[in-house]
Amino acid sequence: MTTIPKIESFASDLTAIRQDFHAHPELGFEEVRTSGIVAAQLRAYGVDEVHEGIGGTGVVGLINGQGGGNRRVGLRADMDALPIEETSGVAYASTNPGRMHACGHDGHTTMLLGAARYLAETRDFDGTVVLIFQPAEEGLGGARRMIAEGL
């Protein structure tokens, strides 16, 4: 498997973030802690613009490439958990009773944070990357609400 050394250099940070998200799952439109961490990480990575509260608890970041240009591409991840009791027994199991990241959204959010960090540090592209961290994907209309609020 081919890997990117720059991403390998912060892979352990991403693992810690994912395990933290997994241990603290939040249901749709309740992703206050998660969205706060996402926004703080984006700012720490040097993302050009960070907008919070889009669609309730959604976060949108913009990274401008070094090549300029008007083209845009959107990358999206969902942040919400499911109303399920976790019984996995892993060290980073849910600490919120009746809530679990059983659908991988903790991983999706972390992967997009990893992409954000890499893109913000390298900026080896033209145009703008729009990072969309969506709340309430599990049937609650988080995407519709983000669009209605200007995404």
Q: Model-found features: residue ranges?
A:
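Acidic/His- and Gly-rich active-site-bordering loop/insert found
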Residues: 2-101, 110, 117-125
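Membrane-interface loop-to-helix entry segments
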Residues: 103-105
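Acidic/histidine-rich catalytic neighborhood of metal-dependent amide-processing enzymes
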Residues: 107-151
